[in-house]
């Protein structure tokens, strides 16, 4: 894998090369909604999961819990659970062979749990794209894992009590790519000096 960031250090000043692979990965990543059926390699999964563990967390607390699911029966169960809160048609995970779930403490226990888990998901999606995998952010995990069925599944995963679902990603080899990049909206950011 090519390094994602070029940093040149001179006289204790850091100069970043403004065209680098990290920025390219961020700008070219897209939500993939069609996957090839073959499973991703173990080392690819490990790279994506490890990238998630390096996401920033409030006060370095490392609250999120990451669960990767490749068992087809459990994926089918997750899909059925998600459909109960899904208004679309078809598989909410788009047939991906791997689902990565992120959990965190309840907001009453740790106020940054949703923020921390979201950063984990973002890191994993960018990492996936950087090694040629496709991913798509999937919602409704909070509702899914608040059910009795969801709580039983969290126990099966060996997770501690008191966690809530933050989100998940569908993960696999892309079967197709979005044809165009939507232009960024005008006035997306402001710089105040």
Question: For each of these PLM feature ranges, what is it?
Answer:
Residues 7-9:
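N-terminal polybasic/positive-inside topogenic patches
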Residues 11-193:
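Acidic, surface-exposed loops and disordered segments
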């Amino acid at each position: 894998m090519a390094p994602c960031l070029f940093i040149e250090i001179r006289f204790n000043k850091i100069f970043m090369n403004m065209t680098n692979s990290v920025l390219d990965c961020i700008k070219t990543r897209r939500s993939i909604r069609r996957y090839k059926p073959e499973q991703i390699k173990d080392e690819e999964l490990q790279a994506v999961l490890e990238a998630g563990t390096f996401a920033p967390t409030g006060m370095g607390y490392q609250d999120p819990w990451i669960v990767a699911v490749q068992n087809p029966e459990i994926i089918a169960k997750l899909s059925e659970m998600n459909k109960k809160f899904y208004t679309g048609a078809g598989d909410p995970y788009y047939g991906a062979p791997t689902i990565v779930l992120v959990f965190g403490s309840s907001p009453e226990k740790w106020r940054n749990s949703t923020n921390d888990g979201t950063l984990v998901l973002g890191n994993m999606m960018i990492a996936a794209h950087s090694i040629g995998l496709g991913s798509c952010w999937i919602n409704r995990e909070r509702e899914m894992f608040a059910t009795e069925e969801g709580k039983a599944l969290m126990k099966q995963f060996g997770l501690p009590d008191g966690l809530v679902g933050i989100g998940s990603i569908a993960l696999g080899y892309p079967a197709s790519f979005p044809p165009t990049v939507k232009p960024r909206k005008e006035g997306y950011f402001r710089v105040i000096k």
